[in-house]
Curated annotation (Swiss-Prot):
Residues 1-51 form the ClpX-type ZB domain. Component of the ClpX-ClpP complex. Forms a hexameric ring that, in the presence of ATP, binds to fourteen ClpP subunits assembled into a disk-like structure with a central cavity, resembling the structure of eukaryotic proteasomes. This is ATP-dependent Clp protease ATP-binding subunit ClpX. ATP-dependent specificity component of the Clp protease. It directs the protease to specific substrates. Can perform chaperone functions in the absence of ClpP. GO terms for molecular function: ATP binding; ATP hydrolysis activity; ATP-dependent protein folding chaperone; protein dimerization activity; unfolded protein binding; zinc ion binding. Keywords: ATP-binding, Chaperone, Metal-binding, Nucleotide-binding, Zinc. SUPFAM superfamilies: Glucocorticoid receptor-like (DNA-binding domain), P-loop containing nucleoside triphosphate hydrolases. It comes from Trichormus variabilis (strain ATCC 29413 / PCC 7937). The keyword Chaperone applies. ATP binds at residues 143-150.
Amino acid sequence: MSKYDSHLKCSFCGKSQEQVRKLIAGPGVYICDECVDLCNEILDEELLDTSGAAAQPAPKSEPPQKRRARSSNLSLSQIPKPREIKKYLDEHVIGQDEAKKVLSVAVYNHYKRLAILQSKGSSKNGADDAVELQKSNILLIGPTGCGKTLLAQTLAKILDVPFAVADATTLTEAGYVGEDVENILLRLLQVADLDVEEAQRGIIYIDEIDKIARKSENPSITRDVSGEGVQQALLKMLEGTIANVPPQGGRKHPYQDCIQIDTSNILFICGGAFVGLEKVVDQRGGKKSIGFVQPGEGQSKEKRAADVLRHLEPDDLVKFGMIPEFIGRVPMVAVVDPLDEEALMAILTQPRSALVKQYQKLLKMDNVQLDFKPDALKAIAQEAYRRKTGARALRGIVEELMLDVMYELPSRKDVTRCTVTREMVEKRSTAELLVHPSSLPKPESA
């Protein structure tokens, strides 16, 4: 036995030679007796399912999204048009027309690239085969709670390709504690049911991308493992490379089998708040004392900041902390507007899964009708706007407001209707709705 035998591990479960009864060696890999038994059980179950398939009823059909995602045949007639994509986004997300247009066009062009790649081998394309369509990754910039992540999540519901959402804050440079950038591809692979070919046609949304900006404009002497190091690691993935993805996630090690994924046809959408970026843009124009910094008439500070960001240039992102190579790989930039009080009121009631509709459905299950007076909705929107966390503040306010009612109603049979008023919103409590049972003369009509 060589001196290295004590360090041998199973390539599948990771157990060492001392922890198992038998370790079988192959060309560069090892498997223990426990994993062999597990593989035999899986094969026996599959053979049993296959032999009994004729006697079993037909399996349930997959959800439409899954069924479409497995289809690899794309034609131009089946591709949703940009207007159709935006119309669906309008049903779930309030405002943000510019960002919706950018996303709709990008997704539509992504579909067309996939359709062309599938028909590239046919001779009827003629001279067009020499024209290669390259992808245009997207960067969404906007304050917290304005709908960046919701746009991506809503987009995922209507796509015929796998869609994964990742968080940049958990990523670190290779060799350090944290997640490798390849774990982003693992999420996409899991959405595609481990179908590599399907995953290579997908779309990835990387949230909180501004959190990997380097800490200073000048290169640092010490390593920035969660900032510039992550940007460097993402470069080839964004542009297109063959990445080795560990199937179980985590760090890669020499004895691990990896899945190879070509990222050339994966569309990347990056989003972040980029707090303070508007100041960089303002300073470039020599407007340190004017523009959005000073209070003006008719516009909020956040709205003026969004207007300044519409004059954004790549150099501004470099000064913020993004490296030039990264910026060059996300050529499409869309600014997401902050939400004002009117937009927050619309978010409460208009979307298909609006917050008010959710609570009405919850109370309906207890046979109680829930109503919000217009001035109550306005008060909720005003408080959410004051908290400066965008639409995320709405749920916190309504949850706090409805706590007493939702605690008591399941045990009460004498309340059939609840009407929330502005006074209740200001008190942050709906407890008074439970004082007078509905069997008494209606107190709200008095």
